[in-house]
Amino acid sequence: MSKNLLTKVTAFALSAAMSVTLLSGCGNNVTDKDEQGRTIISVGGWPTKEGKEKENIEAKKARFEEANKDFVIQGDQWGFDLKSFYAKAAAGQLPVIYNTYFTEVSQIIAAGYSADLTDELKKQGLYDKINKDVLKIVSKDGRVYAFPHAAYIFGIAYNVDDFQAAGLMNADGTPQQPKTWDELAQFAVKLKQTTGRPGFVFPTANNNGGWQFTQIAWSYGANFMEKGSDGKWKAVFNSPEAAEALQWIKDLKWKYDVLPANTLIDHTELYKTFGTRGASMVIGAGDTPGKIVSYDMKPNSIGMMAIPAGPKKWVTLMGGGVYAISNKASEKQIEGALKWLQMTCTPDATDEYKINTEQSFQERAEKGFLVGVKSMSQWNTESSALKFRDEMIDKYANGDPAHVKLYNDFVQDLGGCELRPEEPVCAQELYGILDNCIQEVLTNKDADPKTLLEKANSDFQKNYLDNLDY
């Protein structure tokens, strides 16, 4: 999930781009060669502070340049954010490589600011190793425009001790799986009756509530926006399906009474609540155990399972991060950029990858992180790196494998569950507007989901979608 909010990119982007160009005196081409004739690969997000991160990347730069004499890596301190992105892109001043998110990549591809990587990916043997579901996110019309480096899908994290107390664990050590959102609500009721604590926690603030609400609404049959034949986007979540999904959130508070008393829950508070036994279940991805280790929740007390289905479909949100390569990059720069990225995120189990990966899981186990969750990967089973990662997870597993089996099985075989990326435009603004709707139904017993969504839909259209020009 991106942390940067999309701003209007019409007159602002154009005027800012002109200003940048005038101030810099630069043209619209990425500088290609250094004084020694080496092809320059500028890399965005380069660390500025002295420390381990900078030392590691400088060492990687040295190794890369030693092995690839015709390339030179140049660090660029600019870190991706949409407020400055479109100005830099329009001025031709993007670094060759820049990091972005699933949320933004479709916009960037549509705007033409990322290079076509398809042929070079195939040439370097990368194309056939990318997870096909992830490949869809970074593709347009059968061509690939970004290099994925991380992926995740949501499931449900649960407190094993609470599930055992409530009689919700099976004899084989796996949990009972709520197959629908309504079943999850019933589980939450039983958990609260048993433990006296909230059975479920749901975020409501800093865009997190809207973010997680979208996948619930999708499962009720709702959509949030549609692109017309004229290329313009239309908000469409003033629908009975979206209202039904928001009613489910409302019912968690007023019908089932299974939520914490606190109704302002951001990302940090969400995992703090779960990690301190303030709730028995939370929507989470494979990295959830790492978010709660500081709250001293023991590995054997943490479990993961699949996402429930809604009345219309079974769907989970897939997110992640990608590296894009500037549309101004030369063919030689694209070649070098992908070679560099393979050092950062390789599909192959190189000796360096094996050493680093084993060390990482060993350290996690020693620090009390749950090791055992096999998260979604950007690579498929053709990747030796993915196979080795899973071997190390099995080797250093420090909890009962049965507690996370349902999630691991879900990641490996979705069994008919639809993977859906985040909304294609103005996702962060949408999440913020939906946060307001969620907070209202949780603080006002008389709030009407349909009325709230009518206004939210109108505001989203007027304030954001109508201002897009790409």
Task: Give the ranges of each region predicted by the language model.
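Conserved N-terminal structural module of periplasmic/extracytoplasmic solute-binding proteins
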Residues: 2-111, 122-126, 332, 348, ...
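Alpha-to-beta junction loops
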Residues: 71, 89-100, 113-115, 197-198, ...
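Hinge/lid segment of periplasmic solute-binding proteins
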Residues: 101-155, 164, 179-187, 212, ...
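Extracytoplasmic/periplasmic solute-binding protein
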Residues: 140-149, 154, 164, 182-234, ...
